[in-house]
A protein has these predicted regions:
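Terminal accessory carbohydrate-recognition/targeting modules of carbohydrate-active enzymes
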Residues: 1-249, 276, 283, 294, ...
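Solvent-exposed loop and edge beta-strand segments that line ligand/cofactor-binding
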Residues: 104, 202-211, 268-285, 323-337, ...
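Residue-level signal for inorganic ion chemistry
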Residues: 116, 288, 475
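Aromatic-rich carbohydrate-recognition surfaces in CAZymes
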Residues: 120, 139-145, 152-154, 159, ...
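Short loop/turn segments at secondary-structure transitions that flank enzyme active sites
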Residues: 122, 133-135, 167, 225-229, ...
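Conserved oxyanion/phosphate-binding beta-strand-loop segments in alpha/beta enzyme cores
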Residues: 241-275, 304, 308, 506-516, ...
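Catalytic cores of carbohydrate-active enzymes
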Residues: 252, 319-320, 369, 373-381, ...
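A short secondary-structure junction motif
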Residues: 261-265, 309-316, 340, 371, ...
């Protein structure tokens, strides 16, 4: 069998939803699904399939499931000849009687399109597919319950269901026939959730079976988040595969990957921070502007996204993130607004001036200078102070049982680099010069040549946090203006290379530090505790 059975694939739909899974076909995460839609909140609708094929000699499984405690059944992986993820996921199965079947799927804004075709063999070949449904939040798991509604609306070989009130409906258009035969599949095991110490067992509902005659023609199913049972699956599938084949052939893999993070979330165009569980975060959005948009000639879209964010300036701050389900905006980030200022100026340099962006920049800098939430204020030395107990404000934002692991209260080093750059870009040269002088006088660790991670730690004058972290690099690069030059800048690089550099990236904390965590594993609390205490980023 192929190597890397638990290698993961992910196909975005362009609206913030996606399909994802493993090469083996079984799910290892709660986020693995064939139809996961973004309806303001992300819902898992179709988790997977149970699939098998009847040929003249026998019946063979084409799917693989993993159940608690450690049961793998059926074992479609025993017949899996190959898996490829490019240009889209495709599995090739080779059966003992000489039959070979290819199964592929492609995801579009209209849903997930699945296809099966016999590529070798002769004689009868009947394919059966049982969809496994949940209709749950993508952060949750489902257990068997009486509230799940198996009622089906059927037309020809198409069917739809409304699993729960308030959850998107599910429709499957097919080129086969549908037999309504409700059942529950119990105790699926998700090993990635288990490794994190989280709930890892799920029951799934299967409303019926779709059947296809592969000896006569290829099979297709179109999975959608709606009630509509009208439509021809064959033509829709052919159109989707044809359109995506043409689009993907024009775009290099890196371009397609970049586009995966640019989504239409309702009426908003935005950038999401990552898959599978992140939504749109301010800090990540503004940092990503350069690579995802400006470097690719999409300054107009960058301006559109930034102007949308500008509508949410409050007391000189932008939200840290937009929560799932449209909850209250979270403003606990000191650096996000400063990254916005830098992204706005870089965007306007290409796309032209924007009164809306300029207004937002002034509101942010005025708010920070005069003082806003969480103790954020310009101090007498011109540097930016921030923080209060129990609140995480920088990118090192892990919390365990309500405790902030890296509070960094005071004047964090990268925040000063962002603050000074924002002031200089906005033409506030006097404030920028004063803060730069204070930075050079106060942040250099004379003993090592590196920079302190925080000065005036815990808002105590003169107290420093000398932890060696990668945050200091922003003072010498990555931003429009460097705060140090020459030997001082080289000393920072040497310190980072000596203590933090690995073949995979930079450690978040030097191994010599008593708080260093050498491994990122275990349960959620253990992982969050190690997130910024040594983990390589």
């Amino acid at each position: 069998v192929i190597d890397g059975l638990e290698r993961e694939w992910l196909e975005p739909d362009g609206d913030g939803g996606f399909a994802s899974g493993t090469a083996a076909g079984y799910r290892t995460r709660r986020y693995h699904a064939l139809l996961l839609t973004n309806a303001g909140e992300r819902f898992v609708l179709v988790n997977g399939f149970e699939a098998w094929i009847d040929v003249a000699s026998s019946t063979f499984p084409l799917s693989t499931q993993r159940y608690a405690p450690r049961v793998v059944h059926p074992r479609g992986i025993d017949h899996l000849l190959a898996f490829t993820a490019d240009p889209w996921p495709c599995w090739t199965f080779s059966l003992p009687d000489g039959t070979a079947v290819a199964h592929e799927l492609v995801v579009t804004t209209q849903g997930t399109v699945c296809a099966w075709r016999r590529i070798a063999g002769a004689g009868p070949a009947s394919l059966h597919v049982r969809p496994l449904l949940s209709g749950r939040s993508y952060h949750a798991l489902m257990r068997e319950n009486g509230a799940f509604d198996f009622t089906a609306t059927m037309q020809d070989g198409n069917a739809s269901w409304q699993p729960y009130r308030g959850v998107p409906a599910i429709s499957i258009l097919s080129t086969g026939t549908y037999e309504h035969a409700p059942d529950w599949y119990r105790n699926f095991l998700y090993t990635e959730e288990e490794a994190r110490g989280l709930d890892c067992i799920e029951d799934l509902a299967s409303p019926g079976v779709f059947t296809f005659d592969l000896a006569q023609r290829d099979a297709a199913m179109v999975l959608r988040a709606d009630r509509d049972v009208a439509g021809d699956a064959r033509s829709l599938a052919a159109e989707a595969f044809g359109r995506e084949r043409k689009r993907r052939s024009r775009l290099p893999t890196g371009e397609r990957a970049a586009d995966a993070f640019i989504v239409q979330a309702g009426a908003r165009r935005t950038i999401i921070a990552g898959y599978p569980w992140f939504t749109d975060w301010g800090r990540d959005t503004f940092i990503a502007m350069r690579g995802l948009l400006l470097a690719r000639g999409r300054a107009d879209l960058a301006s559109l996204i930034l102007e949308d964010w500008a509508n949410h300036v409050s007391r000189g701050m932008l939200p840290n993130r937009f929560p799932d389900g449209g909850g209250a905006l979270e403003y606990n980030a000191v650096d996000a607004s400063l990254w916005f200022v830098i992204a706005a100026h870089e965007t306007m340099a290409v796309a032209g001036s924007s009164a809306r962006l300029a207004q937002a920049v002034d509101a942010i800098l005025d708010g920070y200078a005069s003082g806003t939430r969480y103790g954020i204020r310009m101090d007498d030395d011109g540097l930016l102070a921030c923080g209060e107990p129990g609140v995480q404000l920088t990118w090192m934002d892990a919390r365990v049982n309500g405790r902030v692991i890296t509070p960094r209260i005071g004047k964090p080093v990268e925040v000063q680099a962002l603050w000074i750059n924002a002031l200089r870009l906005a033409g506030r040269a006097a404030d920028a010069d004063r803060a730069t002088s204070a930075f050079r006088a106060r942040f250099v660790n004379g003993a090592s040549g590196s920079l302190y991670d925080v000065v005036d730690a815990d808002h105590v004058d003169g107290r420093v946090d000398a932890s060696v972290r990668p945050n200091q690099l922003f003072a010498i690069g990555g931003l429009p203006s460097s705060l140090l030059e020459g030997d001082q800048a080289c000393a920072v690089v040497r310190a980072v290379e000596s203590d933090l550099l690995t073949p995979a990236g930079l450690r978040s904390l030097a191994p010599s530090d008593p708080a260093y965590c050498p491994r990122y594993d275990g349960g959620l609390a253990q992982r969050d505790g190690a997130d910024h205490q040594g983990t390589v980023w």
